[in-house]
Amino acid sequence: MNKIYSLKYSHITGGLIAVSELSGRVSSRATGKKKHKRILALCFLGLLQSSYSFASQMDISNFYIRDYMDFAQNKGIFQAGATNIEIVKKDGSTLKLPEVPFPDFSPVANKGSTTSIGGAYSITATHNTKNHHSVATQNWGNSTYKQTDWNTSHPDFAVSRLDKFVVETRGATEGADISLSKQQALERYGVNYKGEKKLIAFRAGSGVVSVKKNGRITPFNEVSYKPEMLNGSFVHIDDWSGWLILTNNQFDEFNNIASQGDSGSALFVYDNQKKKWVVAGTVWGIYNYANGKNHAAYSKWNQTTIDNLKNKYSYNVDMSGAQVATIENGKLTGTGSDTTDIKNKDLIFTGGGDILLKSSFDNGAGGLVFNDKKTYRVNGDDFTFKGAGVDTRNGSTVEWNIRYDNKDNLHKIGDGTLDVRKTQNTNLKTGEGLVILGAEKTFNNIYITSGDGTVRLNAENALSGGEYNGIFFAKNGGTLDLNGYNQSFNKIAATDSGAVITNTSTKKSILSLNNTADYIYHGNINGNLDVLQHHETKKENRRLILDGGVDTTNDISLRNTQLSMQGHATEHAIYRDGAFSCSLPAPMRFLCGSDYVAGMQNTEADAVKQNGNAYKTNNAVSDLSQPDWETGTFRFGTLHLENSDFSVGRNANVIGDIQASKSNITIGDTTAYIDLHAGKNITGDGFGFRQNIVRGNSQGETLFTGGITAEDSTIVIKDKAKALFSNYVYLLNTKATIENGADVTTQSGMFSTSDISISGNLSMTGNPDKDNKFEPSIYLNDASYLLTDDSARLVAKNKASVVGDIHSTKSASIMFGHDESDLSQLSDRTSKGLALGLLGGFDVSYRGSVNAPSASATMNNTWWQLTGDSALKTLKSTNSMVYFTDSANNKKFHTLTVDELATSNSAYAMRTNLSESDKLEVKKHLSGENNILLVDFLQKPTPEKQLNIELVSAPKDTNENVFKASKQTIGFSDVTPVITTRETDDKITWSLTGYNTVANKEATRNAAALFSVDYKAFLNEVNNLNKRMGDLRDINGEAGAWARIMSGTGSASGGFSDNYTHVQVGVDKKHELDGLDLFTGFTVTHTDSSASADVFSGKTKSVGAGLYASAMFDSGAYIDLIGKYVHHDNEYTATFAGLGTRDYSTHSWYAGAEAGYRYHVTEDAWIEPQAELVYGSVSGKQFAWKDQGMHLSMKDKDYNPLIGRTGVDVGKSFSGKDWKVTARAGLGYQFDLLANGETVLRDASGEKRIKGEKDSRMLMSVGLNAEIRDNVRFGLEFEKSAFGKYNVDNAVNANFRYSF
């Protein structure tokens, strides 16, 4: 800070004079141009006094020192680009920062007094002087830059030329428009703050530190130019119009007065037009006033000063007309403007082409700049280059076929590509664009920083090897692109999440991590690669911890190792790197000075004690107890675990499937890991690495999404963990534990052979689709669900089918079903038949017993298939069914015991053998309405046997209308139990005393409809008998071959519909007899048909063969005879009476005769009456099964259909030279002469016989027959029927005949 520009009132001069910043207080303020000149004159008279009164003052009355430091170092909440930032103050209230994206302070040098403006240039204040340590040697990150020249301008603005391109930042490349008036500046650079647009600027510096707390100032004079102590704030610009910018450093509560040592640091404003931060100026001095107010003065950005220096060190090389530009002995030739004056200058190439080194070229502080989107080739045998570095601007590509000097580091910037094709034997520092490693061990070491650079492998062993493979990811990192090559690391030297390992090639890469001790990788992994960590044996303390992120569709594989995925403890600024030390003996330790860190901590000890947040002042980049953690997202295909441990820690979001064998999985692990060097892991000049891992307990929210397949393993899901098993869960000999506070949701089903212990929450649902409708999911537990805590919750809803017993001794909660569920929530991609079979029409089905006498259960729209004695404290049942049934291991009757039962609109279905039954026992309270009792009807009681079987008991005075009897359909009967209510001194009971049974008309009708499928198939074959060959009249050939295909659909009542496709081929021979032509032949057929109705569906495949004869009389009469056998393979699924799916075979015989006579009305028009009679045989079938324990059977015997048909066809022919087409139409009446077969149904109530019925229908058809030449005929006919119980809706018949 300029020491001579503070103002004090002088009794001698009667006005303000300039004195040192370190002098006493100011009593007035200066105005007027003459007064400024007078001040400057007095400045150089040496009116200086020494004091700390106006050193840096961070106001920590309600803010922490760390807040100001985080601010300047882009740490904590102050990340570059962040918005809506709120600082939590010591009193718990918040301060919201101005409404603007937070600036990136990376252009600010480590010591704060200089700012990079891109390339090899920086700005500062002139009064700092060239020889000042913070100007002569400037540092960003782990790199040191030497000033080689500078240019200055009035009043105090300086721009420096450095010896290297700065790789750590792109720099603050633009300045504010200083020609604007204050009002114009407000419009362009103003931001909203506390509801008002204000001209606010942001700053960072590391001047002499003091803190102000409740008006008291505590100095730390020894602290200045320390990179760790870089601090900042935002200020209000009070004056823009003069040659200085004046800022009010105390206009708001978050105030931090610029100090000695801040001189030259930049003032940033937000350009609302360009949507970026620009530099308004550099610190010149401070005005301090008697009233305690403070203004900082900034020299305005001077573009001309910058451009003059850049022009001095730039040399443009236009290669558009040159074949080769040659550099030899420091001289550039071949470009049309040969020169020797290029030393220390940036050679700025345009036009593309070749650059040839004919000797080694040391360009001092000058670099090579490639300025357009062209390709350049730099060649030169074994000659070397040395200079400021390589800048590939504007997407240019440079093929680098020379070597860089091995005693220097190559600096690479620019968004283009540097394609390195020779081993360099030196180090690379890159911060922008792409570097391609095209040679073995291309560089000794690579330092990548700023987050804008990529290094891509393009050769085997392109990295140098060693512990870190010679690549070091410094602040904000960059990308290593494996480019299809495999790469292994012992450790990846990465300091933050800016480090990225990826593979952009379509060829998969394998990234192997082989750490031999605990190690944290702070970066990210993504792209087309697999991640492997395989060890021969399992050892402790070599855990791999990922706290950055993973994003790949490929797999991760672990063997004999430990892996943790967790979030990252947010990094914060520290006062000092390391502890205070003094090597002097005790009597002389005062010479080492005080421990300023302890002093700073002491100033905030009271706030830390009150708020319990020691992490605010503990001088550590992070702490396990801090509340702010960054969430890491880890997305992969499948994680394969073999004898390994995998944990998901706090603030991790893991997305992927897991396959585990002999492994341990922990989701929500309370053990967390931090690195006390995070953000500062890269050491020295950028080619060293350190870590200090601290392990301890720290809890935060954990997310897991995916599926798990595990064998001989353990799974533990802990407090604050949320697991969404969106894919299937398969647990073989694997115990799963859900601890208190864990929340687990499964969607795609689960199978487990071991107990699942639940202290937290387990929700089982169906699988949702994009419309939030659900496919049913099955949850099968061969062991039990153990509810081990009072807070345990077991939930099933949204089309979940759950199997497994439930056990608990705790006051746990069981919640099955969903209030709003109905079949409309079923996903459109789900078979309704499947859903009905799994869920029984309910939202949830549960099969198992519940032994939880202290637990409470709620069942809404739930089908509980109770398979064993069960006990609950309370049960609330709504729109549900409790269905007592047996299991493979328990055939006994069961008792459900409940202390309190509230039941409404529910059913209780029980079994009985007419002497014993299932029971419902309510101990303390029973309430509800509209509930029904159903009792299985397994056998019919004899008239002399009087039933009196207790089904339900409840405390006396219970309303006897809670339950009522209801009929149920079992088999083919409607069965209504007779329920009698009795009340005694201590209880009320509902008992079974008899049954009423009647035939269920719908069930019998459904059975008859199913068995009628064979008749309809017979009828379709009948309709095919006489449609074989087309029109046989006037055929000249002696023999023929033919083929036909017929496809049709039909329908009947009860929702019946069928469709069929019939294919038939045949051959025949013509016999010319006296007065007639006789055709005899052989045919084979194949038919695919399917049929469905409201309660069944299925398909039939049929094959058949037959013989036929057709006589065509010269008089116009004809007779057609056919005999045929057909075999049918059937598969039908029925949903009535529990029939299920049946596979069975049947067969049928056909004998048909048709006669007709064709009368010619004219030579080419005719009318043809017809009559047909078909007699056949259809084989019978029989099914036997159980429905709800009742034995059922249904059968039909062989029967013989007899079907007649009469009708008339009319037609007209059209002919040409060698063709003839006949159009025809027909109308007929088809009728059954004999009823089709009888169906016999039997259940526990007796036998029911369903007589076959006759049917008839009207047939209608239109068609065309065509003759081409004498031997080719084909036809097409359309047909349908009406007025029948069964009708052909549409049928099309196509035939083709070839005669020879």
UniProtKB/Swiss-Prot annotation:
Q: Which GO terms describe its biological process?
A: proteolysis
| Gene Ontology cellular-component terms listed | cell outer membrane; cell surface; extracellular region; periplasmic space
The Peptidase S6 domain extends over 57-311
Q: Which residues form the signal peptide?
A: 1-55
E.C. designation(s): 3.4.21.-
Give GO MF terms, alphabetically.
serine-type endopeptidase activity
Q: How is its activity regulated?
A: Inhibition of cytotoxic activity by phenylmethylsulfonyl fluoride.
According to the entry, every stretch annotated as the Autotransporter domain falls at 1034-1300
Q: What does the entry say induces or represses the expression of this protein?
A: Expression is optimal at 37 degrees Celsius, and inhibited at 20 degrees Celsius. It is dependent on both temperature and pH.
Q: Which InterPro entries would you find in this protein's record?
A: Autotransporte_beta, Autotransporte_beta_dom_sf, Autotransporter_pectin_lyase_C, OM_autotransptr_brl_dom, Pectin_lyase_fold/virulence, Peptidase_S6, Peptidase_S6_dom
Quote the Gene3D superfamilies the UniProt record gives: 2.160.20.20, 2.40.10.120, Autotransporter beta-domain (2.40.128.130)
Q: What free text does the record give on domains? A: The signal peptide, cleaved at the inner membrane, guides the autotransporter protein to the periplasmic space. Then, insertion of the C-terminal translocator domain in the outer membrane forms a hydrophilic pore for the translocation of the passenger domain to the bacterial cell surface, with subsequent cleavage.
Protein name per its UniProtKB record: Serine protease EspP
Originating gene: espP
